Amino acid sequence: MLKLRLKKYGRKGQASYRLVVMPSTSKRDGRAIEELGFYNPCTNETHINVERVKVRLSQGVKPTSTVKNLLDKVIF
């Protein structure tokens, strides 16, 4: 099953996250199928490719609870 989830990157104490599509059984920092945007909680900066997210959601990709909350703030 594919999931829409956050992949951590950045420095210690200054984490940033990429919004990616990946299998639910993969590790957090594993290989992603597609990158759809990023989220930086330190600067509250967010960039999401809304069209690709809607396409992936229509294909049956399930977002994690954190991603769902993020999408509710940004998109809907």
Swiss-Prot record:
A Gene Ontology BP annotation from the UniProt entry: mitochondrial translation
This protein's GO CC annotations: chloroplast; mitochondrion; small ribosomal subunit
GO molecular function annotation: structural constituent of ribosome
Subcellular location: Plastid, Chloroplast
Disulfide bond positions: none
Domain of life: Eukaryota
Coiled coil ranges: none
UniProt entry keywords in alphabetical sequence: Chloroplast, Plastid, Ribonucleoprotein, Ribosomal protein
One Pfam family named in its UniProt record: Ribosomal_S16
Predominant localisation class: plastid
Family: Belongs to the bacterial ribosomal protein bS16 family.
Protein name: Small ribosomal subunit protein bS16c
Protein's organism: Guillardia theta (Cryptophyte)
